[in-house]
């Protein structure tokens, strides 16, 4: 089976961008509360 590189990159970005956004929000709330 041939791996579609563009599909893999699109999936990786689709997962990583919201995850990074949530981590940034979490860090901001943790630093502001403490």
Swiss-Prot record:
Pfam families on file: PsbM
Membrane topology term: Single-pass membrane protein
Membrane-crossing residue ranges in chain numbering: 5-25
Top-level lineage group: Eukaryota
Location in the cell: Plastid, Chloroplast thylakoid membrane
InterPro entries for the chain: PSII_PsbM, PSII_PsbM_sf
GO CC annotation terms, alphabetical: chloroplast thylakoid membrane; photosystem II
Alphabetical UniProt keywords: Chloroplast, Membrane, Photosynthesis, Photosystem II, Plastid, Reaction center, Thylakoid, Transmembrane, Transmembrane helix
GO BP terms, alphabetized: photosynthesis, light reaction
SUPFAM superfamilies: Photosystem II reaction center protein M, PsbM
UniProt main location, coarse: plastid
Assembly and interaction partners: PSII is composed of 1 copy each of membrane proteins PsbA, PsbB, PsbC, PsbD, PsbE, PsbF, PsbH, PsbI, PsbJ, PsbK, PsbL, PsbM, PsbT, PsbX, PsbY, PsbZ, Psb30/Ycf12, at least 3 peripheral proteins of the oxygen-evolving complex and a large number of cofactors. It forms dimeric complexes.
Function: One of the components of the core complex of photosystem II (PSII). PSII is a light-driven water:plastoquinone oxidoreductase that uses light energy to abstract electrons from H(2)O, generating O(2) and a proton gradient subsequently used for ATP formation. It consists of a core antenna complex that captures photons, and an electron transfer chain that converts photonic excitation into a charge separation. This subunit is found at the monomer-monomer interface.
UniProt cross-references to PANTHER family, sorted A to Z: PHOTOSYSTEM II REACTION CENTER PROTEIN M (PTHR35774:SF1)
HAMAP family xref list: PSII_PsbM (MF_00438)
Protein family according to the UniProt entry: Belongs to the PsbM family.
Name of protein: Photosystem II reaction center protein M
């Amino acid at each position: 089976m041939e791996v579609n590189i563009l599909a893999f990159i699109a999936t990786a970005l689709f997962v990583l961008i919201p995850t990074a956004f949530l981590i940034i929000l979490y860090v901001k709330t943790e630093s502001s509360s403490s």
